[in-house]
Amino acid sequence: YISVNSKPEDLSASKTVARKFINKFLQKNKDFQVEEIDLYKEHIPRLEYQYFEKRNCIVNEDDAKKLNDKDQKEVQRIRALCDQFISANVYVISAPMWSLSFPAPLKEYIDCIMQDQKTIKFEGKKIEPLLNDKPRTMVYIQSSGGNVPWMLRPILNKGLNYVEDIIKFMGIKKFEELLVDDTGFTEEEKQEAINKAYEKIDDIIDSMKF
């Protein structure tokens, strides 16, 4: 579970819906364990040129030893984030819509997990996905203050579209969106949006295959 919101859970519509989703998912899939990462609390490295030996490929362990201590720790952290992502079967991201996109920490996280020979591979001039090795599902839970008409979503919902594209680019074929739209300005409006999102949870969970 990847949360991308600095608000406490009880103040965040996206995190509130995500928690409900996770709890219901675990009720129906008792063999699963949840790992949680809060991108506002965890350290997500900002990628520097010296961390790479080639495009989208982190330096190998021998070359990493030539870096200073700080850079070595950053490379180790990038590897750990990528390996953690690869190990999962189901991914849940909760994020608000900000400026037609999402908060910046999510992009920094995605940059860390887009790694050659890990989540993608280069075959000549072609890029091949590597996360199509088993059934995987991404559930993207997004809150927004207004209600974006479905006809305008390709234009206005750029963050959601980007996440879906990049996830499928890595080979995760099943992408589900759970939108908490029209949270408005009052607590009543927010709760109504949350309740509407709750109604969609069971159908999404029941559609998953492992």
Task: Tell me the role of every PLM-derived stretch.
Residues 1-95, 100-108, 199-210:
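N-terminal beta1-alpha1-beta2 submodule of the flavodoxin-like/Rossmannoid cofactor-binding fold
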Residues 4-6, 143, 180:
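Cofactor-binding loop segments of dinucleotide-utilizing enzymes, especially the Rossmann-like FAD-
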Residues 6-10, 147, 184-185:
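Short histidine/acidic/glycine/proline-rich micro-motifs that form metal-
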Residues 26-29, 132-135, 168-170:
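A short, structured loop/turn motif at beta-sheet edges
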Residues 31-33, 136-137, 174:
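Residues at the starts of beta-strands that form the adenosine-phosphate
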Residues 40-42, 144, 181-183:
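Short, solvent-exposed coil/turn elements at secondary-structure transition points
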Residues 70-161:
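Helix-loop-strand module that forms the ligand-binding subsite of alpha/beta enzymes
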Residues 150-210:
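Glycine-rich phosphate/pyrophosphate-binding loop and the adjoining helix
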